[in-house]
Amino acid sequence: MAKRKEVILQETLNTQEAWEVAMNSGKLYVVDAHQKWCGPCTAIVGMLKRIKNELGDDLLRFATAQVDVIDTLEQYRGKCEPNFLFYGGGELVAAVRGCNAPLVQETIQETLKNEHKILSGEMERKVFRDVYSDTPDQEEEEEDEEEEEGGVVSKQITVALIKPDVVQNGQVDEILQKISEAGIEVLADEERMLTVEEARDFYKNKEEEEYFDQLIDYVTSGPCRVLVLTKGESGEGVVTLWRDIIGPFDAAVAKEENPDSLRAIYGTDATSNALHGSSSTEEAVRELGFFFPDFKPPTYRSAKSAASRASGRRSKTPSQKPRLQRTLAIIRPDALQAHKDSILQKIDEAGFKIAMQKEMVLTREQAESFYSEHKDTDYFEPLVKQMTCGPVLALCLAHDDAVDHWRSMLGPKVVADAVEEQPDSLRAQFRVEEAEVNMLHGSDSAEAAEEELSKIFHVEQTLAVIKPDAIDEKEQIMGKLKEAGFMISCQKDMNLSKEIASEIYKSKEGSEYYDHLIDHMTSGPTLMMVLSAENAVEKLRDIMGPTDPEVAKESHPESLRAMFAKSILENAIHSPSTNESAQEKIRIVFGDAQFDWDVNDMQAEEGEVNETSGEQPTDEQSGETEKTEEDGEHEGAQSDQQQAVSEAMEKEE
């Protein structure tokens, strides 16, 4: 028996030629226009299949299109939310923003009906003007309205990659010095060994180039240094500035056209070009998520919205519509008992990161308070009853446009509608037949998400310092911190100057052990981190363990000091003992910038700026703190001094 030919639901339009063929076909095309790196919207496929089967209309076509490679769709590049575009006779006749299944279905029916009338001569086609193709003047008017609102926005960032040969040649410090001289701030600095798979994913925009395989071999030949960069108060222009500094992609061309550029100095050709820089603000956000999924850029308060100019063209930035968001998900009791593992697997497959989670039993009062806005609805009582009949699992989910992405996966709130319109949605798949409400909650806006998350998760921030004696184990320590549920909101490698170390230990100035404490903390590089978690201050101190590593090994063998400390003096990690002290130390190290998950409002009063405390120490300052190996051994051998320092640190911490 002959094998049945598979029917393709959605055509794949991934070249300009394929696009033009489709647009010249005379059909009505419903196009899921998506970024290559995030793929098409899968939550709506079930509905499209049902519509195709029910209507059976040959005029109707479904397709997916990568906006990255189709010039006609250039204005949709960098738009992370789903865009469903309706083309009749090659003209745009309608558009639906976001995965709104009922609206997509309604628009399909309406535009199909109109196309039949147009083809029969009953009406003329009306071309739809999409807001994404507005003129620069129209965009600027909209942005001016947004700027009047003001508010706290994220600083713009770019991602830099110092490639393996430069790292192996010991030229990283030279480049870091040039970065500092250009007025660029390093927000994060991490050594990373890329796998072949990671490198192919990162450079997928180069996969059609002849040198692609050589490029992959090159960037995986040794460790890279990955940097997150910003500049000034807002970070505006840092993408363009960094690309100007590194020069043309092909280092051979750079040597001819821009001999002072970093690629001209450190690179050889298009493959071995020494450095990487994000090509746009949108790419910077994608690359930030690729290398530092937990990292949130600092924010600043501005009277203007954070609109950027990328390559001379004004465009909306991630800070106006954040691409990296968090949202609250709740698995209700019946589903938690019956489908927990399956739901968590779906969340993982969709690319969400679970930043925090908490299983809890709500009282009736708590449930009523949480859903107070629904108090006058028919489903309020069944909802409260469901939320209090057993434990719920609350999840903080992180993803690009997390709020919309999670809600698109959930489907309609009414279970019957979800089953009918989006049978592949989570509310349809994991319904409980006897329940009167759906089994999954999702915040309906970014503002609601923040409010709801604050009700569930009582987040604090604290400072963690990986000391010079444990800096070689920083990756393992950071891994342990992440496993314990901490989010790294910001990090900075520093060679502490005596000035900054003195500020951190200011309360111990004048004591007999003060100089030894300062000498130890300035004896080599440290890693400063702002950690966010529920009850972060107390939680981190529990994980660190006792000051004396021998005591830690006996009483807290799983603690960080039991695993990584060498002695009482060299005990791996430090953190403040109170929330007030933590906020003070964060200001000393990172200045007055705001960091995401800041529940203590670390915002400085307007006009007050600490100009020095957040600076990266210069090479000159670092040189003042250099110590010989013999000096370190001599200090480590002085047990009386170690004990004095230990007592000081116990009091300080």
From Swiss-Prot:
Annotated protein name in UniProt: Thioredoxin domain-containing protein 3 homolog
Domain notes for this protein: Contains 3 inactive NDK domains that each lack the active His residue, suggesting that they have no NDP kinase activity.
Keywords: Developmental protein, Differentiation, Disulfide bond, Redox-active center, Spermatogenesis
Domain Thioredoxin: 9-114
Family in the record: In the C-terminal section; belongs to the NDK family.
Region of interest: NDK 3: 459-597
Stretches the record annotates as NDK 2: 324-459
Function: May be required during the final stages of sperm tail maturation. May act by reducing disulfide bonds within the sperm components.
Low complexity composition-biased segments: 301-310
A matching Pfam family: Thioredoxin
Protein's GO biological process: cell differentiation; CTP biosynthetic process; GTP biosynthetic process; spermatogenesis; UTP biosynthetic process
Organism encoding this protein: Ciona intestinalis (Transparent sea squirt)
Tissues in which the protein is found: Testis-specific.
Coiled coil start-end: none
Annotated stretches, region: Disordered: 300-323, 603-653
Encoding gene, per UniProt annotation: CiIC3
Amino acid composition bias (Acidic residues), ranges on this chain: 617-633
Top-level taxon: Eukaryota
Region of interest called NDK 1, as start-end residue ranges on this chain: 155-299
